[in-house]
Amino acid sequence: MASPALRHFLPRFGAAAAAASFLSLAGCQLGGNDPETVLPVSGTFPLKGLAQNVSVRRNNMGMPLIESSSYHDALFTLGYVHAGDRISQMLGMRLLAQGRLSEMAGADALDVDRLMRSVNLKQNASDLYNAASPRLKRFFDVYARGVNAYLFRYRDKLPADIASSGYKPEYWKPEDSALIFSLLNFSLSVNLQEELSALVLAQKVSADKLAWLLPTYPDEELPFAEADKLKGLNLNNQVTGLSDLNRIALQLSDLNMLGVAASSNWAIAPQRSRNGKSLLASDMQLPAGLNSAWSFVQIRAPKYQVSGVTIAGMPLVLSGFNGKLAWSMSNVKGDNQDLFLEKIKREGNRVSYMVDGKWLPAAAHQETFLVKGGSPLRETVYETRHGALLNASATPPGNGLSLALQVPNFKDDKSLDAFFDLSRAPNVEKAFDTSREIRAITLNMIFADASNIGWQVTGRFPNRREGQGLLPSPGWDGKYDWDGFADSMLHPYDQDPRQGWLAAANQRTIPKGYGMQLSNSWGYPERAERIAELANGGKQDLRSTIAMQYDQTTTFAAKLKSMFQAPGMSKPLKQAIDALPEADRNKAREAFTRLMAFDGKLSATSADAALYELFLQESAKQIFLDELGPETSPAWQALVANASSSYSPQADHLLGRDDSPYWDDVKTPQKEDKPAILARSLAAAITSGDSLLGSDHKAWQWGKLHRDNWASTSPLAKQLGGGEFNRGATPTGGDHTTLNVSGFEWGKGFDARMAPGLRMIVDFSLVEPMTGLISTGQSGNPASPYYANSIEPWQKGQYQSIPVQQQNYEKGYGKQRLTLTPGK
């Protein structure tokens, strides 16, 4: 998952920077690493709210083991420990979800707040919380009291990014955990950002050409009918606030809060396991940087034992192992959001919108923004039958077009209860029953017990009367409206398949022409193809599964070679290369020869991997830049952004689309074709490599172009010089198509923007089945020994065993412990 990389769309202290400052997963400590801001790892401390003593031990990663004689005390302690490790993350996510970042960050965050108020996650969270059982509400209440125990005890020792802002944190409410869940759900949705980007592209090219920029999958037809929805509409400067909306949506994507692109999970059935028991692997991916949003926890209490993955702010184990069942999640890339273009008429303060030829009054309510350093602002949010009119600027809707966002409602949703019940499920059969109740979030849930494996798609998917949801629909025409939701019993699932494995890597997981519309925003197919190659290649065990998670071989390279050698391409491409000027001709021939010999292994030290990626980058520019450029233009940024979230026109054109109009370079008098542009791209790859890596082509290395930047995303840390917050940059291999995912911006730069944030493997044949690893650190506080301490083990693949048997706790966690006692 992703979830989950800061691109530079604004100056350092613009809205993106302001948001990053307080969503930064690394707390900032002014004046040095103050140990007083860190939870102790040993000693005895009273804590009001506990009924009995609780023990907290830490392993080498910093993962806490919470041992308690009651589930109440375990949840209370989880809230306390989450806050101690990640309070900056928790408060930043809450403020973002509420649309209140400007209270801490000032006016620079106001546009983000405007968008988030109109999205109204607070209402979604309220619906989820109100629909939860009394039992679940009690759990959230106890957890909140644990968070508040931390906020009270450390009220004068909070991380400096909070303290220096002057912001006084409010106490945590039980509903706030539902709000964090709603933000996670929002972050998994790529549709808002993709539809905005598509609309930006529609302003640049005609509807006839637009479909070529919106491919959905290699074997799917281009969406010409979908693009026809926009024919006859004057989009240029007619959509209120579109440029601001797109800018803020891109920033949210960069903050890992919109359109988390990647995650992989798979399960191996006993017949394909070397030791005759199931295996489950989970690879949860996020934008690169400090720190991963994911963290580990282990809880041992009467009738509840679980180890797994959490997000601070929620008392739920989202992926994990309970001693009998292992479960994991990845992003379906489900399409459950739609933008609607609304015809707007403004008369004074009254706003109307058109429905089937009639003007209807838009509902309105006031929002107040308490901006740090400024006066309170009151602004009006308008709502149509589809949803709120999105706004990311001070410009109110006027006569023309505005955008409304429709999302499912969750008034009867039991997802929060279902996640808790899943963590207690004893087997795959029960996991199916509980996961079908998860409707608020679109996930590929894969689970395993010792003898069985299963896969279930969760979520709530709208039935559209017409349209595919790729582009905003005319809201004034009811034929594009939603007509209820797909029955959850129709959601795709599988159990114990004959092939002996199940896998989800953001690819299209359903056959072409499947009976319900799950999505048209699928990721690239190559990671899933590689899982299939390896899973079918022999018996699997823990060692081979670790190798799979670190695999850097792309199947796209072989497809590229097949395209070069295709009967209709081989000869024309040779002729196009021969027609180049001599210097370019020699470069193109060298690039072609080396790419044809390339084995697809994208290791950091590979010269041919560097050339391969240079070719991918240059081909995107040669194909599209003449019509969508310059590289700073909104259209080009939209193309790059969509390529980072789903299957792209860059890939689609390389492997096919020989008749696309984009093969012609409109800046030349002649008409180019695909072979001509490919020949230019081959030569340009060498030219670019010479500039970036030097003239000794054998000495090129992919890792010299492609790096993991272990840097805090907080501009406050940058303002202080980085220093204690950052951990430098390291060469890395892979790309967006490899299992060890390391995506870059296709058409922009080479730095890694997406990386696995946490890995988990459960091998049921082992005495202690669970192992795991986090990419950065358990803590977001640089003063903690568990801040960024996992980078080196991560790079070396040094997994940590996570014991579930009590007699093995000392080996996994040591003897040192923090004892929390009931306070008065």
UniProtKB/Swiss-Prot annotation:
Swiss-Prot/TrEMBL catalytic activity: an N-acyl-L-homoserine lactone + H2O = L-homoserine lactone + a carboxylate
EC category name: hydrolase
InterPro entries for the chain: Ntn_hydrolases_N, Pen/GL7ACA/AHL_acylase, Penicillin_amidase_A-knob, Penicillin_amidase_dom1, Penicillin_amidase_N_B-knob, S45
Major subcellular location class: periplasm
Signal sequence range: 1-26
Catalytic residue positions: S264
E.C. number: 3.5.1.97
Keyword terms of this UniProt record: Hydrolase, Periplasm, Quorum sensing, Signal, Zymogen
Location relative to the cell: Periplasm
GO MF annotation, one: hydrolase activity, acting on carbon-nitrogen (but not peptide) bonds, in linear amides
Pfam family name, one: Penicil_amidase
GO biological process: antibiotic biosynthetic process; quorum sensing
SUPFAM superfamilies, per the entry: N-terminal nucleophile aminohydrolases (Ntn hydrolases)
Gene Ontology CC annotation, any one: periplasmic space
Extra remark: AHL-mediated signaling mediates quorum sensing in many species of Proteobacteria, regulating hundreds of genes, including many that code for extracellular virulence factors.
Subunit: Heterodimer of an alpha subunit and a beta subunit processed from the same precursor.
Family: Belongs to the peptidase S45 family.
Purpose: Catalyzes the deacylation of acyl-homoserine lactone (AHL or acyl-HSL), releasing homoserine lactone (HSL) and the corresponding fatty acid. Possesses a specificity for the degradation of long-chain acyl-HSLs (side chains of seven or more carbons in length).
Protein name per its UniProtKB record: Acyl-homoserine lactone acylase QuiP
Protein species of origin: Pseudomonas syringae pv. syringae (strain B728a)
Upper classification of the organism: Bacteria, Pseudomonadati, Pseudomonadota, Gammaproteobacteria, Pseudomonadales
Annotated gene: quiP
